Amino acid sequence: MRTIEIRKVSITFLDTDAIVNAANEGLFAGGGVCGAIFKAAGYEQLQKACDRIGHCDTGSAVITPGYNLKSKYIIHAVGPRWKDGRHKEPEQLYGAYYKSLELAAANHCGSIGFPLISAGIFGYPVHAAWRQAFDACGDYLDQHKDVSLHIVFAALSDEIIETGQKTLLESGASRYKIAGRNDWARLDMPEQRDTFIFQRTFTAQQMASLRHGHIPRQMEDKWFWFMEGDTLFAHRSWTGFCIFRIDFKPDNHHVVTVNRNPDQYTCTSTAEDAQKLNELLNWWIQDPYDYYHEWLDETADALKAAGKNIPEKHPSIIIR
Protein backbone atom coordinates (compact mmCIF):
# COMPACT_ATOMS: atom_id res chain seq x y z
CA MET A 1 0.00 0.00 0.00
CA ARG A 2 1.56 3.29 -1.15
CA THR A 3 -0.81 5.94 0.11
CA ILE A 4 -1.01 9.29 1.87
CA GLU A 5 -3.85 10.39 4.12
CA ILE A 6 -4.60 13.12 6.66
CA ARG A 7 -6.46 12.26 9.87
CA LYS A 8 -7.92 14.38 12.62
CA VAL A 9 -6.23 12.65 15.54
CA SER A 10 -3.48 13.11 18.09
CA ILE A 11 -0.31 11.57 16.72
CA THR A 12 0.16 9.68 20.00
CA PHE A 13 -3.01 7.69 19.22
CA LEU A 14 -1.76 6.37 15.88
CA ASP A 15 -0.97 2.67 15.54
CA THR A 16 1.40 3.10 12.60
CA ASP A 17 4.68 1.18 12.76
CA ALA A 18 6.50 4.45 13.42
CA ILE A 19 5.50 7.97 14.37
CA VAL A 20 7.59 11.08 13.84
CA ASN A 21 8.45 13.51 16.60
CA ALA A 22 8.92 17.15 15.66
CA ALA A 23 12.23 17.27 17.50
CA ASN A 24 14.93 19.81 18.30
CA GLU A 25 18.66 19.39 17.66
CA GLY A 26 19.35 18.53 21.31
CA LEU A 27 16.68 15.79 21.29
CA PHE A 28 15.24 16.90 24.61
CA ALA A 29 11.56 17.05 25.51
CA GLY A 30 9.89 20.22 24.35
CA GLY A 31 6.36 21.50 24.08
CA GLY A 32 3.57 20.80 21.62
CA VAL A 33 3.83 17.56 19.66
CA CYS A 34 7.26 16.79 21.10
CA GLY A 35 6.06 17.09 24.69
CA ALA A 36 2.97 14.97 24.00
CA ILE A 37 5.08 12.19 22.47
CA PHE A 38 7.55 12.16 25.37
CA LYS A 39 4.68 11.99 27.84
CA ALA A 40 2.89 9.16 26.01
CA ALA A 41 6.05 7.13 25.37
CA GLY A 42 7.38 7.52 28.90
CA TYR A 43 9.54 10.55 29.55
CA GLU A 44 12.45 8.96 31.42
CA GLN A 45 13.11 6.04 29.08
CA LEU A 46 12.67 8.09 25.92
CA GLN A 47 14.95 10.86 27.18
CA LYS A 48 17.64 8.29 28.02
CA ALA A 49 17.45 6.91 24.49
CA CYS A 50 17.70 10.40 23.04
CA ASP A 51 20.61 11.26 25.33
CA ARG A 52 22.52 8.25 24.01
CA ILE A 53 22.18 9.68 20.50
CA GLY A 54 22.95 13.18 21.73
CA HIS A 55 22.30 15.35 18.68
CA CYS A 56 20.48 15.53 15.36
CA ASP A 57 21.14 18.14 12.69
CA THR A 58 18.35 20.29 11.34
CA GLY A 59 17.00 18.62 8.21
CA SER A 60 17.83 15.12 9.41
CA ALA A 61 16.31 12.44 11.65
CA VAL A 62 17.20 9.67 14.11
CA ILE A 63 15.24 6.72 15.47
CA THR A 64 14.45 5.31 18.94
CA PRO A 65 12.06 2.67 20.26
CA GLY A 66 8.43 3.69 20.75
CA TYR A 67 8.28 2.42 24.34
CA ASN A 68 4.74 2.95 25.70
CA LEU A 69 3.28 4.06 22.37
CA LYS A 70 1.36 1.78 20.02
CA SER A 71 4.06 2.46 17.44
CA LYS A 72 7.22 0.35 17.51
CA TYR A 73 9.47 3.30 16.68
CA ILE A 74 9.73 7.04 17.16
CA ILE A 75 11.60 8.87 14.43
CA HIS A 76 12.88 12.22 15.68
CA ALA A 77 12.98 14.67 12.76
CA VAL A 78 14.41 18.16 13.21
CA GLY A 79 12.70 20.75 11.07
CA PRO A 80 13.93 24.32 10.61
CA ARG A 81 12.84 27.44 12.43
CA TRP A 82 11.20 29.78 9.94
CA LYS A 83 13.05 33.00 9.19
CA ASP A 84 12.08 34.21 5.74
CA GLY A 85 12.35 31.16 3.48
CA ARG A 86 15.74 32.21 2.16
CA HIS A 87 17.89 30.48 4.78
CA LYS A 88 17.54 26.90 3.45
CA GLU A 89 14.32 26.32 5.38
CA PRO A 90 12.55 24.55 2.46
CA GLU A 91 15.51 22.24 1.82
CA GLN A 92 15.86 21.45 5.52
CA LEU A 93 12.17 20.70 5.98
CA TYR A 94 12.14 18.51 2.88
CA GLY A 95 15.22 16.71 4.21
CA ALA A 96 13.63 16.05 7.60
CA TYR A 97 10.70 14.29 5.93
CA TYR A 98 12.80 12.40 3.41
CA LYS A 99 15.26 11.13 6.03
CA SER A 100 12.34 10.01 8.19
CA LEU A 101 10.96 7.96 5.31
CA GLU A 102 14.38 6.41 4.71
CA LEU A 103 14.63 5.41 8.36
CA ALA A 104 11.12 3.94 8.31
CA ALA A 105 11.92 1.80 5.27
CA ALA A 106 15.31 0.73 6.67
CA ASN A 107 13.53 -0.51 9.80
CA HIS A 108 10.91 -2.43 7.81
CA CYS A 109 8.00 -0.14 8.64
CA GLY A 110 4.89 -0.46 6.51
CA SER A 111 3.32 2.69 7.89
CA ILE A 112 4.47 5.99 9.36
CA GLY A 113 2.68 8.86 11.08
CA PHE A 114 3.81 12.48 10.75
CA PRO A 115 2.87 15.72 12.43
CA LEU A 116 3.14 18.88 10.33
CA ILE A 117 6.80 19.48 11.14
CA SER A 118 7.94 23.05 11.93
CA ALA A 119 4.44 24.52 11.61
CA GLY A 120 4.00 25.01 15.36
CA ILE A 121 6.36 26.99 17.56
CA PHE A 122 9.00 26.94 14.79
CA GLY A 123 6.70 29.24 12.82
CA TYR A 124 6.78 27.69 9.35
CA PRO A 125 3.79 28.91 7.26
CA VAL A 126 1.18 26.16 7.15
CA HIS A 127 0.61 25.97 3.39
CA ALA A 128 4.34 26.02 2.67
CA ALA A 129 4.94 23.38 5.35
CA TRP A 130 2.36 21.09 3.78
CA ARG A 131 3.91 21.64 0.37
CA GLN A 132 7.35 20.48 1.50
CA ALA A 133 5.80 17.51 3.30
CA PHE A 134 3.96 16.30 0.22
CA ASP A 135 6.85 17.02 -2.14
CA ALA A 136 9.17 14.90 0.02
CA CYS A 137 6.67 12.06 0.43
CA GLY A 138 5.72 12.04 -3.25
CA ASP A 139 9.34 12.10 -4.37
CA TYR A 140 10.25 9.31 -1.98
CA LEU A 141 7.45 7.04 -3.20
CA ASP A 142 8.25 7.85 -6.83
CA GLN A 143 11.92 7.03 -6.31
CA HIS A 144 11.34 3.85 -4.29
CA LYS A 145 8.70 1.93 -6.20
CA ASP A 146 9.59 -1.28 -4.37
CA VAL A 147 8.71 0.24 -0.99
CA SER A 148 5.18 -0.25 0.35
CA LEU A 149 4.51 2.55 2.82
CA HIS A 150 1.27 4.03 4.15
CA ILE A 151 1.86 7.64 5.22
CA VAL A 152 -0.49 9.27 7.73
CA PHE A 153 -0.45 12.93 8.72
CA ALA A 154 -2.01 13.61 12.12
CA ALA A 155 -3.45 17.02 12.99
CA LEU A 156 -6.14 18.37 15.30
CA SER A 157 -6.92 21.76 13.76
CA ASP A 158 -9.72 21.77 11.18
CA GLU A 159 -8.08 24.72 9.43
CA ILE A 160 -4.73 22.96 9.17
CA ILE A 161 -6.41 19.77 7.92
CA GLU A 162 -8.42 21.66 5.29
CA THR A 163 -5.28 23.41 4.07
CA GLY A 164 -3.52 20.06 3.94
CA GLN A 165 -6.27 18.39 1.91
CA LYS A 166 -6.27 21.21 -0.63
CA THR A 167 -2.48 21.29 -0.84
CA LEU A 168 -2.28 17.53 -1.31
CA LEU A 169 -4.68 17.66 -4.24
CA GLU A 170 -2.57 20.42 -5.82
CA SER A 171 0.71 18.58 -5.32
CA GLY A 172 2.53 15.95 -7.34
CA ALA A 173 1.80 13.48 -4.54
CA SER A 174 -1.96 13.71 -5.14
CA ARG A 175 -1.98 10.30 -6.87
CA TYR A 176 -1.10 8.74 -3.51
CA LYS A 177 -3.96 10.41 -1.66
CA ILE A 178 -6.65 8.16 -0.24
CA ALA A 179 -9.92 9.33 -1.76
CA GLY A 180 -12.69 10.62 0.49
CA ARG A 181 -16.29 11.72 -0.04
CA ASN A 182 -15.37 15.41 -0.11
CA ASP A 183 -12.73 15.09 -2.84
CA TRP A 184 -15.20 15.34 -5.74
CA ALA A 185 -18.65 16.72 -6.50
CA ARG A 186 -21.12 13.86 -6.02
CA LEU A 187 -24.76 13.01 -5.48
CA ASP A 188 -26.22 10.42 -3.12
CA MET A 189 -27.78 7.20 -4.34
CA PRO A 190 -31.40 7.96 -5.41
CA GLU A 191 -34.47 6.29 -3.90
CA GLN A 192 -34.88 4.28 -7.12
CA ARG A 193 -32.47 1.41 -6.49
CA ASP A 194 -32.03 -2.35 -6.49
CA THR A 195 -29.80 -4.67 -4.49
CA PHE A 196 -28.18 -7.95 -5.42
CA ILE A 197 -25.50 -10.30 -4.08
CA PHE A 198 -22.16 -10.17 -5.86
CA GLN A 199 -19.84 -13.10 -5.17
CA ARG A 200 -16.13 -12.49 -5.66
CA THR A 201 -12.93 -13.02 -3.68
CA PHE A 202 -10.37 -10.24 -3.34
CA THR A 203 -6.79 -10.48 -2.13
CA ALA A 204 -5.50 -8.13 0.56
CA GLN A 205 -3.55 -6.24 -2.10
CA GLN A 206 -6.63 -5.87 -4.29
CA MET A 207 -8.67 -4.57 -1.35
CA ALA A 208 -5.88 -2.09 -0.59
CA SER A 209 -6.19 -0.75 -4.14
CA LEU A 210 -9.95 -0.36 -3.72
CA ARG A 211 -9.51 1.35 -0.34
CA HIS A 212 -7.13 3.82 -1.97
CA GLY A 213 -10.04 4.97 -4.12
CA HIS A 214 -9.64 7.23 -7.12
CA ILE A 215 -9.92 10.98 -7.65
CA PRO A 216 -10.38 11.92 -11.34
CA ARG A 217 -7.63 14.02 -12.88
CA GLN A 218 -8.24 13.87 -16.64
CA MET A 219 -11.27 14.19 -18.91
CA GLU A 220 -11.06 10.47 -19.64
CA ASP A 221 -11.37 9.68 -15.92
CA LYS A 222 -14.97 8.49 -15.81
CA TRP A 223 -15.16 7.23 -12.22
CA PHE A 224 -14.67 8.63 -8.74
CA TRP A 225 -14.77 6.05 -5.99
CA PHE A 226 -13.93 5.97 -2.30
CA MET A 227 -14.42 3.66 0.64
CA GLU A 228 -15.79 4.30 4.11
CA GLY A 229 -15.31 1.32 6.39
CA ASP A 230 -16.16 -1.72 4.28
CA THR A 231 -18.42 0.17 1.86
CA LEU A 232 -17.34 1.40 -1.57
CA PHE A 233 -19.19 4.25 -3.29
CA ALA A 234 -18.74 4.52 -7.07
CA HIS A 235 -19.75 7.79 -8.77
CA ARG A 236 -19.67 8.94 -12.37
CA SER A 237 -17.09 11.72 -12.44
CA TRP A 238 -18.82 13.91 -15.03
CA THR A 239 -22.22 13.94 -13.31
CA GLY A 240 -21.53 12.91 -9.72
CA PHE A 241 -24.26 10.24 -9.93
CA CYS A 242 -23.74 7.35 -7.51
CA ILE A 243 -24.08 4.21 -9.65
CA PHE A 244 -22.90 1.43 -7.33
CA ARG A 245 -22.52 0.96 -3.60
CA ILE A 246 -20.74 -2.21 -2.51
CA ASP A 247 -20.89 -3.48 1.06
CA PHE A 248 -18.00 -5.94 1.26
CA LYS A 249 -18.64 -9.04 3.40
CA PRO A 250 -16.15 -11.48 5.00
CA ASP A 251 -17.85 -14.46 3.32
CA ASN A 252 -17.29 -12.83 -0.13
CA HIS A 253 -21.04 -12.54 -0.77
CA HIS A 254 -21.00 -8.78 -1.15
CA VAL A 255 -24.19 -6.67 -1.14
CA VAL A 256 -24.43 -4.31 -4.11
CA THR A 257 -26.88 -1.43 -4.31
CA VAL A 258 -27.37 -0.15 -7.86
CA ASN A 259 -28.87 3.09 -9.16
CA ARG A 260 -32.21 2.55 -10.94
CA ASN A 261 -33.00 6.16 -11.88
CA PRO A 262 -33.26 5.92 -15.69
CA ASP A 263 -32.03 9.49 -16.06
CA GLN A 264 -28.80 8.54 -14.28
CA TYR A 265 -28.15 4.92 -15.23
CA THR A 266 -29.90 3.07 -18.02
CA CYS A 267 -29.15 -0.55 -17.20
CA THR A 268 -32.15 -2.47 -15.77
CA SER A 269 -30.79 -6.02 -15.47
CA THR A 270 -28.91 -7.22 -12.40
CA ALA A 271 -27.09 -9.75 -14.59
CA GLU A 272 -25.78 -6.88 -16.74
CA ASP A 273 -25.02 -4.89 -13.58
CA ALA A 274 -22.95 -7.75 -12.19
CA GLN A 275 -21.05 -8.14 -15.46
CA LYS A 276 -20.40 -4.40 -15.67
CA LEU A 277 -19.30 -4.21 -12.04
CA ASN A 278 -16.99 -7.18 -12.45
CA GLU A 279 -15.33 -5.51 -15.44
CA LEU A 280 -14.93 -2.25 -13.52
CA LEU A 281 -13.42 -3.99 -10.52
CA ASN A 282 -10.92 -5.74 -12.79
CA TRP A 283 -9.66 -2.27 -13.69
CA TRP A 284 -9.90 -0.72 -10.24
CA ILE A 285 -7.86 -3.38 -8.43
CA GLN A 286 -4.88 -2.65 -10.68
CA ASP A 287 -1.95 -0.79 -9.16
CA PRO A 288 -1.65 1.68 -10.70
CA TYR A 289 -5.19 2.05 -11.99
CA ASP A 290 -5.17 2.53 -15.79
CA TYR A 291 -8.14 4.86 -16.22
CA TYR A 292 -7.22 5.73 -19.82
CA HIS A 293 -7.46 2.20 -21.19
CA GLU A 294 -10.60 1.59 -19.16
CA TRP A 295 -12.05 4.63 -20.89
CA LEU A 296 -10.97 3.26 -24.29
CA ASP A 297 -12.65 -0.07 -23.56
CA GLU A 298 -15.87 1.51 -22.34
CA THR A 299 -16.02 3.97 -25.23
CA ALA A 300 -15.33 1.22 -27.74
CA ASP A 301 -18.13 -0.92 -26.29
CA ALA A 302 -20.56 2.01 -26.47
CA LEU A 303 -19.66 2.76 -30.09
CA LYS A 304 -19.93 -0.91 -31.01
CA ALA A 305 -23.40 -1.06 -29.45
CA ALA A 306 -24.33 1.96 -31.57
CA GLY A 307 -23.32 0.08 -34.73
CA LYS A 308 -20.08 1.95 -35.38
CA ASN A 309 -17.15 0.23 -37.09
CA ILE A 310 -14.22 0.08 -34.66
CA PRO A 311 -11.14 -1.65 -36.15
CA GLU A 312 -9.18 -1.68 -32.89
CA LYS A 313 -9.91 -0.92 -29.26
CA HIS A 314 -6.28 -0.20 -28.46
CA PRO A 315 -4.28 1.95 -28.61
CA SER A 316 -6.84 4.27 -30.26
CA ILE A 317 -10.47 4.31 -31.32
CA ILE A 318 -11.18 5.04 -34.98
CA ILE A 319 -14.74 5.64 -36.15
CA ARG A 320 -15.44 4.89 -39.83
Question: What annotation goes with each model-predicted range?
Answer:
Residues 81-173:
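Phosphate/ribose-phosphate-bearing ligand recognition and processing surfaces
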Residues 107-110, 227-230, 249-253:
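A short, structured loop/turn motif at beta-sheet edges
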